[in-house]
């Protein structure tokens, strides 16, 4: 369990603050931006033998690199199978943190890690001052965040209609961006929570990476997770408590989530845009109501004048001319316009596009009908 706690803390900070106290061993960390703080306190009963300091010696406070301490507990699955006992001691004279792993078959691994003396790292927070509180098994919340993409940075937690707890992926709105990001949302009923004290419409947005780190530890230990929060912009406090350990995670929240939380859980937010309805698959009977004559006029206008074989208005940019015949035009080319090779006659397109939906009496069997009289009498 100690190794899992270190893995959970490694998702937040790059330095580990280790402090032996009279009431237990404290492991703390904070991220570089000071927006996330985590603390685990292992009670003396968690250890087979615990001594905070030798008689007449002051308590040591030290910090070490997270990567150095994480290398000792890198492979958790292997440690659970091979390690029987772990001994941790602080040597103030040599500034060394000694970690000994007593493995099976008498194998002993010793890690000497250098540390630095430091002041006590303590965040000021009070869960009792938060008006909203949720408590649920960590397994329930872990399954709720499972569908979210691993690259997602923030997630919004709020109370929707019917006192449903909603987890929704948060994306920053960009005015000059037309791309629509995929939105993932999970809803949990009130019956999934052991305690739910929050009013409808409240919502906070916090980092998902740190939240997943706490969930992975709490779920492996089969613990309940409590979430204490206030208005957006105020820190959210995540706590786990057991007879052998206490855990506190304090995460900063975004302060501009009021506009996103007003319609949290409302069905109108998830309705498709009206413009998208035009791209839906039409019903088979819709073809009978279409104005096929308008399509026929557009198609037969291109073949009405047999003298001027002009193709429909298709924008074709003139391609590069071949070098062997630059600027050469024969009389036949001037008398008859060039046609695109491989382009079928318009009559065949008409038969293909409209032959299956026209009545047999209106199928183009003979010559194409003339929709406009000849202009011979105007002379």
From Swiss-Prot:
Its main location: nucleus. Its EC number is 3.1.11.2. Constitutively phosphorylated on serine and threonine amino acids in absence of DNA damage. Hyperphosphorylated by PRKCD and ABL1 upon DNA damage. Its phosphorylation by PRKCD may be required for the formation of the 9-1-1 complex. Phosphorylated at Ser-330 and Ser-375 by CK2, promoting interaction with TOPBP1. The modification Phosphotyrosine is found at residue 17. Residues 40-80 are annotated as: Possesses 3'-5' exonuclease activity. Residues 257-271 have a biased composition (Basic and acidic residues). The modification Phosphoserine is found at residues 261, 266, 317, 330, 363, 368, 375. GO terms for molecular function: double-stranded DNA 3'-5' DNA exonuclease activity. It is found in: Nucleus. Keywords: DNA damage, Exonuclease, Hydrolase, Nuclease, Nucleus, Phosphoprotein. It comes from the Eukaryota. Residues 255-379 are annotated as: Sufficient for interaction with ABL1. GO terms for biological process: cellular response to ionizing radiation; DNA repair; DNA replication checkpoint signaling; mitotic intra-S DNA damage checkpoint signaling. Pfam families: Rad9 (PF04139). GO terms for cellular component: checkpoint clamp complex. CDD domains: PCNA (cd00577). Residues 257-289, 308-379 are annotated as: Disordered. It catalyses: Exonucleolytic cleavage in the 3'- to 5'-direction to yield nucleoside 5'-phosphates. Component of the 9-1-1 cell-cycle checkpoint response complex that plays a major role in DNA repair. The 9-1-1 complex is recruited to DNA lesion upon damage by the RAD17-replication factor C (RFC) clamp loader complex. Acts then as a sliding clamp platform on DNA for several proteins involved in long-patch base excision repair (LP-BER). Component of the toroidal 9-1-1 (RAD9-RAD1-HUS1) complex, composed of RAD9A, RAD1 and HUS1. The 9-1-1 complex associates with LIG1, POLB, FEN1, RAD17, HDAC1, RPA1 and RPA2. The 9-1-1 complex associates with the RAD17-RFC complex. RAD9A interacts with BCL2L1, FEN1, RAD9B, ABL1, RPA1, ATAD5 and RPA2. Interacts with DNAJC7. Interacts (when phosphorylated) with TOPBP1. Belongs to the rad9 family. This is Cell cycle checkpoint control protein RAD9A. It comes from Macaca fascicularis. The gene is RAD9A.
């Amino acid at each position: 369990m100690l190794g899992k706690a270190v893995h959970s803390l490694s998702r937040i900070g790059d330095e580990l603050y280790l402090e032996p106290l009279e009431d237990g061993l404290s492991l703390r960390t904070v991220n570089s931006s000071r927006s996330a703080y985590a603390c685990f306190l292992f009670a003396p009963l968690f250890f087979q033998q615990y001594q905070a300091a030798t008689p007449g010696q002051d308590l040591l406070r030290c910090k070490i690199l997270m990567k150095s301490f994480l290398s000792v507990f890198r492979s958790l699955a292997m440690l659970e199978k091979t390690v029987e006992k772990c001994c941790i001691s602080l040597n103030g004279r040599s500034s060394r943190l000694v970690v000994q792993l007593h493995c099976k078959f008498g194998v002993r691994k010793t890690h000497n890690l250098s540390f630095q003396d430091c002041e006590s790292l303590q965040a000021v927070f009070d869960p009792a001052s938060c008006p909203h509180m949720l408590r649920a098994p960590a397994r329930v919340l872990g399954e709720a965040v499972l569908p979210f993409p691993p690259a997602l940075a923030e997630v919004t937690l709020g109370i929707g209609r019917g006192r449903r707890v909603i987890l929704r992926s948060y994306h920053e709105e960009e005015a000059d961006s037309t791309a629509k990001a995929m939105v993932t949302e999970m809803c949990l009923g009130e019956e999934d929570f052991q305690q739910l004290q929050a009013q409808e419409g409240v919502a906070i947005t916090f980092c998902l990476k740190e939240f997943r780190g706490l969930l992975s530890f709490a779920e492996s230990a089969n613990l309940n997770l409590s979430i204490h929060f206030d208005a957006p912009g105020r820190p959210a406090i995540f706590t786990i408590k057991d007879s052998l350990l206490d855990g506190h995670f304090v995460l900063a929240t975004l302060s501009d989530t009021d506009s996103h939380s007003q319609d949290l859980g409302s069905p109108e937010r998830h309705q498709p845009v009206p413009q998208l309805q035009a791209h839906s698959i039409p019903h088979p009977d819709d073809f009978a109501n279409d104005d096929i004559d308008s399509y026929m006029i557009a198609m037969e206008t291109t073949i009405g004048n047999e003298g001027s074989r002009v193709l429909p208005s298709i924008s074709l940019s003139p391609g590069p001319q071949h070098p062997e015949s630059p600027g050469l035009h024969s009389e036949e080319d001037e008398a008859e316009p060039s046609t695109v090779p491989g382009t079928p006659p318009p009559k065949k397109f008409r038969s293909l596009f409209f032959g299956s939906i026209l009545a047999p009496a209106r199928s183009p069997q003979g010559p194409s009908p003339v929709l406009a009289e000849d202009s011979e009498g105007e002379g």
